[in-house]
Amino acid sequence: MFNFRLFSRRGKSLGLLAIVLLLFGFYSLKSSMPVYSNSIGSPSAHSSSYKGVSKAKTSPQDPDSVVMLIVSFDDHYDSSRSDSSSVFLDKVLSDRTEYALRHGYTLVHKKARDIQARYGVYGTWSIIPALRETLAEYPDAGWIWLLDAKAVIMNPSESLKDRVLKPEKLSQHLLLNSPIDPLKNYIRTRRKMDPSDVFVITTSDYNGISTRSLLIKNNNFAPFLLDAWNEPLLKSAGFDQAERSALSHLLEAHNTILDHVALVSPKVLNSYTNSAVDLNYEEGDFLVILQDCENAAACERIFDNYYQQRKLPAIKKQLSEETVDEQS
């Protein structure tokens, strides 16, 4: 005898399975397409004047124009001062100002606490919406350069173009077929890369891919990457290296993203203090990331030490009453 009850149960199960497969297919298709978020404010939504720092004008589609982004966190401020000021951060901004003025770049300062309040993100995850805001605010910039506040530009006379953005320079510095994460040797950069296909330039260290000195080309790929990187599922995944691990996961899971991310030697964009020989700062390196400073006072002492060692050819352009967007 035909078992109608069994047939009914099987039919329901197959129906549910079909729905799940359809939803999965729709989500996969959606996630593979560029996403343009409307959650970011208008170009002037979070802008205010910051006296003494450079704001350069960029021409439409200028491939050499750069917006330098610095995101400051609470540990960059002096907790002993009631006005929440920071001698350390002032020195960092002065260093970045000098570099921006010299090369005609724009400098943007965003406070992590304000980013966190606007978007409900925490810790270093705030660099992602900070980058996304900057893209919206400067649509004509060629590149966005996110550089950690705990860094000193040691060779301010060298432009990013001459350092790494020229195709011949980028080709020279590319790490091809190189592990992105030392614990996942199978995740590697491409064996061949055309500089014209490179939309993200960064480095890796013993903790995997780094976000402390990162360049993102301002094209259609940038919002696609940042929106994928900012997915709530990634933020709730409990990655041990937060946004760094999330970016590594995206490179592992999405060939479209991996195709456009280039690694260069840490010595090119991201030398460290107190690190292994292949990562440690040496005289002549472009910049140095300050390790092992957990508060503004400690960072200031280390900053001063390296700041005095910089290469300082004569600066032709004096600091003036120009402005930079400080996000508040």
Swiss-Prot record:
Keyword Endoplasmic reticulum: yes
EC number: 2.4.1.-
Principal subcellular localization: endoplasmic reticulum
Superkingdom of origin: Eukaryota
Claim: Endoplasmic reticulum is one of the keywords in the record: yes
Residue intervals passing through the bilayer: none
Subcellular location: Endoplasmic reticulum
Gene Ontology CC: endoplasmic reticulum; Golgi apparatus; Golgi membrane; mannan polymerase complex
Keywords carried by this UniProt record: Endoplasmic reticulum, Glycosyltransferase, Signal, Transferase
A single GO molecular function term of this UniProt record: alpha-1,6-mannosyltransferase activity
UniProt xrefs under Gene3D superfamilies: Spore Coat Polysaccharide Biosynthesis Protein SpsA, Chain A
Pfam families: Glyco_transf_34 (PF05637)
GO BP field: protein N-linked glycosylation
Extent of the signal sequence: 1-32
Family membership noted in the UniProt record: Belongs to the glycosyltransferase 34 family.
Protein name in the entry: Uncharacterized alpha-1,2-galactosyltransferase C8D2.17
Species, as recorded: Schizosaccharomyces pombe (strain 972 / ATCC 24843)
